From Swiss-Prot:
This is Isoleucine N-monooxygenase 1. Belongs to the cytochrome P450 family. Pathway: Secondary metabolite biosynthesis. The gene is CYP79D3. Heme binds at C470. It is found in: Microsome membrane. Residues 1-8 are cytoplasmic. It comes from Lotus japonicus (Lotus corniculatus var. japonicus).
Length: 535
């Protein structure tokens, strides 16, 4: 693997970084030496690259950025579906096999239900006071109860139907205006990534703040400067949460921000707070002054929650932090899945034809597709499910932390072990999927069985499973399927005139398409169906 040359070249390129690492390593050497020796004797761990003394495999990780791609390449070279990578004093266990994944999240779920405390999640959760990013404990239990019982319950899901419909209608209005507007690149050219991401952002703002815009209302239904800045900040946080920062494994280096992750996340969080906090503060004042008496959105719901003593259940800090986390969780899967799926379907036009035929048969062309139509849209849902399988948003799920020494299969994992389930490799494992790299929605269709976007057997990860499963399955499923259904029912899609097919190549740093998908849209329905006056 050329370990020594990579290590030496990295030392030459970043000598001051490695000097600090070495200094810190020797500081902790006396404390950790005996512990590490005993640990290696006591625990039986999966195969992995031979670690360097003290720093483990940190040199390889730093020499092969991004680490997510390096880990997958390493496991392929080792021909293993579970590995052990030592990053300083942290044991990281990546998993690419659904059967092994179920051992962790189903059979031994109680032992692996926590989260590691690292720099990025500390910042994104404002000190671990939210839900998804928070270690197992009383704070997590409190905030999860709030989500499950008060924000994402079936009753609240139905209560918010009208707001979701408004944003689905606005999506149609926005794309229709793009079709009718003469632009430099010609009428109808749509950036699918922008449209899909801002649909998610609009749904978030409408459900939480009962408004589509932070700033000026845009006449075409599209995003303004404020909405663009907000959604970009959201995806920046997503990018750097669990991005294998060196300070996560050598905490002494956190404030030095050697890889720049800390400053990027903090800047994105400042942008989020810039838009959220004034609205939240003003809304609380309205309730306190008696100017508001009726709950209209989820912010109102959070403000009015009371504890057993009739005091506010959430502190202001908890409320604000949880709203930021909701923004992060609501925008990721739908937009990326749709962009990839539509690109795949353009290259396989028979799939696009079948999806639109199903929509026409179920809905017709005299009205817009609604959430009540979703149970009948089996092929459309199969397209969404296949996109989540083949084209996940991230390489790995949120890490699971081992809370006590646990035996899984033939291995004994020590407390503090981090387990990473590979969203990419689970969904593309050839032992579980025939022709796994082919986009084939048909594989999910079975007579008499409803197509769902969840996958409890972890053959791919959409909403995960176990104690740390996503409580927003209904909302996430609805947003994803409605994005697919409205865009496919309302418009016909084709490549620009100078493009014969879509290049299905991911970015070198993440799992987005390397180039945003640009397609020509043409309305399929009567003009009056695209009009909306809602803001």
């Amino acid at each position: 693997m050329g370990l020594m040359p990579d290590f030496l070249s990295l030392c030459h390129e970043f000598p001051w970084t490695f000097l600090l690492v070495v200094i810190f390593s020797f500081m902790i050497f006396k404390v950790t030496k005996t512990h590490l020796v005993n640990k290696s004797k006591k625990y039986k761990l999966p195969p992995g690259p031979k670690p360097w003394p003290i720093v483990g495999n940190l040199p390889e990780m730093l020499a092969n950025r991004p680490a997510t791609i390096w880990i997958h390449k390493l496991m392929k070279e080792m021909n293993t579906e579970i590995a052990c990578i030592r990053l300083a004093n942290t044991i990281v266990i990546p998993v690419t096999c659904p059967t092994i994944a179920c051992e962790f999240l189903k059979k031994h779920d109680a032992s692996f239900a926590s989260r590691p405390k690292i720099m990025s999640t500390d910042i994104a959760s404002d000190g671990f006071i939210t839900t998804v990013l928070v270690p197992y404990g009383e704070q997590w239990k409190k905030m999860k109860r709030v989500l499950v019982n008060n924000l994402l319950s079936p009753q609240k899901h139905q209560w918010l139907l009208g707001k979701r419909n408004e944003e689905a209608d606005n999506l149609m209005f926005y794309i229709y205006n793009k079709c009718c507007k003469d632009v430099n690149d010609g009428p109808g050219l749509v950036n699918i990534r922008i449209a899909a991401q801002h649909y998610g952002g609009n749904v978030f703002r409408k459900l939480i703040f009962n408004s589509r815009y932070f700033g000026k209302v845009m006449e075409d239904g599209g995003p303004g400067f404020e909405e663009v800045e907000h959604i970009n900040a959201t995806f920046t946080i997503l990018k750097y949460v669990y991005a294998f920062s060196i300070s996560d494994f050598v905490p002494f280096l956190r404030r030095l921000d050697l890889d720049g992750h800390r400053s990027k996340i903090m800047k994105a969080m400042r942008i989020m707070r810039k838009y959220h906090d004034p609205i939240i503060d003003d809304r609380i004042k309205q309730w306190n002054d008696g100017l508001k008496t009726v709950e209209e959105d989820l912010l109102d719901v959070l403000i009015k929650l009371k504890d057993a003593n009739n005091k506010p259940l959430l502190t202001l800090k908890e409320l604000k932090a949880q709203i930021i986390e909701l923004a992060i969780e609501m925008v990721d899967n739908p937009s990326n899945a749709f962009e990839w799926a539509l690109a795949e379907m353009i290259n396989q036009p028979e799939l696009l034809k079948r999806a639109t035929e199903e929509l026409d048969n179920v809905v017709g062309k005299e009205r817009l597709v609604q959430e009540s139509d979703i149970p009948k849209l089996q092929f459309v849902k199969a397209c969404a499910r296949e996109a989540l399988r083949l084209h996940p948003m991230e390489y790995f799920n949120v890490p699971h932390l081992c809370m006590n020494d646990t035996m899984v299969g033939d291995y004994l994992f020590p407390k503090g072990t981090q387990v990473l389930l590979s969203r990419v490799a689970l969904g593309r494992n050839p032992k579980f999927w025939t022709d796994p790299l082919k986009f084939n929605p048909e594989r999910h269709l079975k007579e008499g069985i409803d197509v769902v976007l969840t996958e409890p057997d972890l053959r791919f990860i959409s909403f995960t499973t176990g104690r740390r499963s996503c409580p927003g399955v209904a909302l996430g499923t609805t947003m994803t399927v409605m994005l697919f259904a409205r865009m496919l029912h309302g418009f016909s899609w084709s490549p620009p005139p100078d493009v014969s097919s879509i290049d299905l190549v991911p970015s070198k740093d993440d799992l987005f398409l390397a180039k945003p998908l640009l397609l020509v849209a043409k309305p399929r329905l009567a003009a009056e169906l695209y009009r909306t006056n809602e803001i």
